[in-house]
């Protein structure tokens, strides 16, 4: 079962969306970290929707951030937990992209 990703978005400047840019943040960050790039990029891509999902899991050790999957050498999770988390994140992102 896929998890629904919470997103932040910036609509196209023209009001007519013909393309989309999806920003994926890194470990411990959140959607807002990258969505600010929409302003300078939007001037050059006026028909583009900019969207940034938050990763589905709260980041261990960084309570205001999110993670797509655990990273063993950072959070002491196991390789198995990391691989399961990565596969779940891939499924979540595929469902998210299919719904755009």
Question: What role is predicted for each listed range?
Answer:
Residues 2-100:
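Serine-hydrolase catalytic machinery in alpha/beta-hydrolase-like enzymes
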């Amino acid at each position: 079962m896929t998890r629904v990703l919470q997103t932040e978005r910036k609509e196209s400047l023209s009001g007519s969306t013909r393309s989309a840019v999806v920003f994926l943040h890194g470990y411990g960050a959140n959607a807002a970290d990258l969505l600010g790039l929409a302003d300078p990029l939007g001037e050059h891509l006026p028909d583009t929707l900019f969207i940034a999902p938050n990763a589905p899991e709260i980041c261990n050790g960084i309570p205001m951030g999110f993670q797509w999957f655990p990273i063993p050498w950072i959070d002491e999770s196991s390789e198995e937990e990391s691989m399961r988390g990565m596969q779940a994140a891939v499924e979540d992102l595929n469902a998210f992209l299919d719904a755009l």
